[in-house]
Regions:
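Hydrophobic alpha-helical transmembrane segments of membrane proteins
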Residues: 1-113, 122-272
Length: 272
């Protein structure tokens, strides 16, 4: 009928309008990220530095804790133990220290008030900020994967599970960082230096990631060390499954909490 056709047309137009707004939000976020050299450099630094560290570690011969004991390991256990070191640095520098997420609100500065007048739910604005942070992180994860495959001569069995875990933890930590910045943003800065160099708060998630990374690296070393007493393939598989599940749980809990409290924290932000 004509009424049904009009309803479908209206629904289609609403979808197109929302899609256009999301695209505009995404482009605005990209421009906001790269409008200042300091913000841009610090935001993408982790994605560039981490894969370089992976390559440097290989050439200087940095050994995993298990290798340092001189214990002979199978190729799977040896690769698993070595990947633990890469996983640690990637969690700390790539996931925990992503300024794209840690300064998602703060870098708005005096333009923050514009967000109050954008005709979309604030939840969509937060989703966009997380998407941009994810984009930066995921580029770094792909580069780490490529670097790791290169230096390990194609150790797919160990590198690919690590890569999948890094995708999960990048999203989880980006959500944590955006939520933390929403709760305590600095939007009254006059120079980016104030929120980048003289602000310890955005660096805190890096220490969360460092703690997780150390714990994971120790567990991986123990699994590799005692491979003769366990089924190493099963041990490696269970480790990565458990690690990824933990990351998913963290991401879900943070995003559910953020969804409930985002508007409250958004409303109380003042630009002086």
């Amino acid at each position: 009928s004509g009424e049904e056709t009009r309803r479908k047309s209206s629904a289609k137009n609403d979808v197109l309008v929302l899609s256009g707004k999301k695209k505009a939000l995404f482009l605005r976020e990209i421009k906001c990220l790269f409008r200042n050299q300091s913000f841009a450099f610090n935001s993408v630094m982790g994605s560039v530095v981490t894969p370089l560290i992976v390559v440097v570690m290989y050439f200087i011969g940095l050994k995993s804790p298990t290798e340092q004991t001189g214990q002979a390991l199978s190729s799977l256990a040896n690769g698993f133990s070595n990947v633990g070191v890469t996983f640690f640095y990637s969690l700390m520098l790539l996931c925990g220290m992503n300024y794209t997420a840690s300064l998602a609100i703060s870098r708005e500065g005096s333009t923050f008030c514009v967000l109050r007048y954008i005709p979309v739910d604030f939840s969509e604005i937060l989703k966009t900020k997380i998407k941009v942070a994810n984009l930066v992180s995921y580029v770094g994860v792909v580069l780490v994967c490529a670097a790791s495959l290169g230096v390990t001569k194609g150790d797919v069995a160990n590198v690919l599970p690590m890569t999948l875990a890094l995708f999960v933890y990048a999203y989880a930590f980006n959500s944590i960082c955006v939520f933390r910045d929403l709760k305590k943003p600095n939007v009254s800065w006059t120079s980016p230096y104030e929120v980048i160099k003289r602000n310890f708060y955005p660096m805190v998630p890096m220490f969360y990631a460092m703690g997780l990374g150390i714990a994971f690296m120790v567990i991986m070393s123990v699994i590799a060390k005692y491979e003769s007493a366990i089924n190493i393939k099963l041990g490696v598989s269970l480790f990565w499954i458990g690690t990824i599940v933990i990351g998913v749980v963290i991401a879900v809990v943070v995003n559910v909490t953020m969804k409930k409290k985002a508007q409250f924290f958004f409303d109380r932000i003042n630009v002086n």
